[in-house]
Curated annotation (Swiss-Prot):
Sequence positions bearing N6-carboxylysine: 174
Matching HAMAP family: Salvage_MtnW
Name the UniProt record assigns to this protein: 2,3-diketo-5-methylthiopentyl-1-phosphate enolase
Required co-factors: Mg(2+)
Active site, per annotation: 99 (proton acceptor)
Organism lineage string: Bacteria, Bacillati, Bacillota, Bacilli, Bacillales
Miscellaneous note of the record: Has no RuBP-carboxylation activity.
Any GO molecular function: 2,3-diketo-5-methylthiopentyl-1-phosphate enolase activity
Organism: Bacillus cereus (strain AH187)
The keyword Flavoprotein is annotated on this UniProt entry: no
Group of enzyme by EC: isomerase
Amino acid sequence: MSGIIATYLIHDDSHNLEKKAEQIALGLTIGSWTHLPHLLQEQLKQHKGNVIHVEELAEHEHTNSYLRKKVKRGIIKIEYPLLNFSPDLPAILTTTFGKLSLDGEVKLIDLTFSDELKKHFPGPKFGIDGIRNLLQVHDRPLLMSIFKGMIGRNIGYLKTQLRDQAIGGVDIVKDDEILFENALTPLTKRIVSGKEVLQSVYETYGHKTLYAVNLTGRTFDLKENAKRAVQAGADILLFNVFSYGLDVLQSLAEDDEIPVPIMAHPAVSGAYSASKLYGVSSPLLLGKLLRYAGADFSLFPSPYGSVALEKEEALAISKYLTEDDAFFKKSFSVPSAGIHPGFVPFIVRDFGKDVVINAGGGIHGHPNGAQGGGKAFRAAIDATLQNKPLHEVDDINLHSALQIWGNPSHEVKL
């Protein structure tokens, strides 16, 4: 294979999956085949999409009810020749799912890139090992927290929040994805002030914390804004990838003048991936494609919290981010939304040690503030790695957190 193989979930009311698959393969490549003269067929053969797999699935009554008709469901795979498209994500996505996405009854499940095609994508600049080296933390999951309630607040408020989270033992603090350029907390001022706070905490407590600042602005201003952030001392760039496009992420990741990790936020991605019947699968969108395009971290809904993904999907995202690949470094999985210390054993059991535990309210809502919230999470992480039940841990901050949010992992064994 020198091109790309697309895997689709299709629904067909004519009950002929093979015919529908062939129609898709032709419609997204040469348009027609049987009515072409033999000589023209020979000329176009190398450009034709080829159906390589058709698998019928069991009938699903909920699907029939939703679509208001009886359909045959199936998984199909089509190989698209590399000759047909330039080696970039806009061309690949348009080839494999462009007008097909308008069908409303087809879901793009996966894209399998040939080795030749993979060479055109950067992958993470730092990856898991590189991030761990920045923090000098190699033996446990990382802990991340989020600035909360920053809109309308000044730099002083930001510095106080940042200091408390860092003292609490948080490894990474990220901006809220809805904090954009503004007069009270402009980009470079956030970075400079944040570094002063984090350096002070490091000198006093010996704990290193990185700050992920939100990269925003018009698309053609992003590189300039990113370089300003780097010059000001930015540790990590948070980026709302799907508000801009995967190719924009790749452009940032490939730029040698932006030598910092990039954290991909999933904002807007639900518009592409939420349906079980159409769109793009979450594992492909938030896992494989983000990694290929250069994200060092991928945030996605956890299976446990307030905006939950099905566990199978969340684990598939993580698999794509972390599986061995000779072409790409591994990206950090960041299962998010509604996470509190009682979920830590679940997260470690399901995602392993190479994960970022991301909390907002679970840190800021602690009765001892963000310092107490961070310490509660760190105690939960340490106990989990020792296979010690959380309720047996002699830590006042963790005990308080479990009283507030509960301990659903009471029976979890690693």
